[in-house]
Amino acid sequence: MENVSNVDKVESIKSLQSTIRKLENALSQMTQKGANTTLVKKRLKAVCIGLAVLENVWNQESHQYIDEELAEARNILAGLLPSIEKAYDKSKAGSPQRTLLTRRIKALELSIQAIDKLFNK
């Protein structure tokens, strides 16, 4: 966790911010259609927590999350990885989609490490 380059930090934060926007848009559309939004809400909260924890570890910004929320977010973020990795495996080498997925995987992995680091203090 300590040896993360500034480029990786910036890309990870941007990736998580992009993921948050994507989930917010999905939540809005699903709400309008009357669809069940529980899963999207949980994922949105988990990604927000992941971003807050990375900013806490890297930029010493405070976060207001309790241990139970951190633990739940960690499990949700870890649960997202297999489906993203599967999409990555199906993507074409050098494609913008693969670049996006690479950054998203890295950001999620770093978020999980950051949450683990908070628990091991």
Predicted feature descriptions by range:
Residues 1-7, 28-32, 56-67:
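Short, charged, low-complexity loops and linkers
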Residues 2, 8, 14, 118-121:
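Short acidic DE-rich linear segments
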Residues 6-9, 37, 70, 98:
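Short amphipathic alpha-helical segments that mediate assembly, nucleic-acid/protein binding
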Residues 8-24, 43, 69-85:
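Short amphipathic alpha-helical heptad-repeat segments
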Residues 29-36, 90-95:
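A cross-kingdom feature marking solvent-exposed beta-strand/loop segments within repeated
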Residues 35-46, 96-107:
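Short, charged, amphipathic alpha-helical segments
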Residues 46-64, 83-90, 107-121:
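Amphipathic alpha-helical coiled-coil segments
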Residues 63-93, 98, 102:
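Amphipathic protein-protein interaction modules
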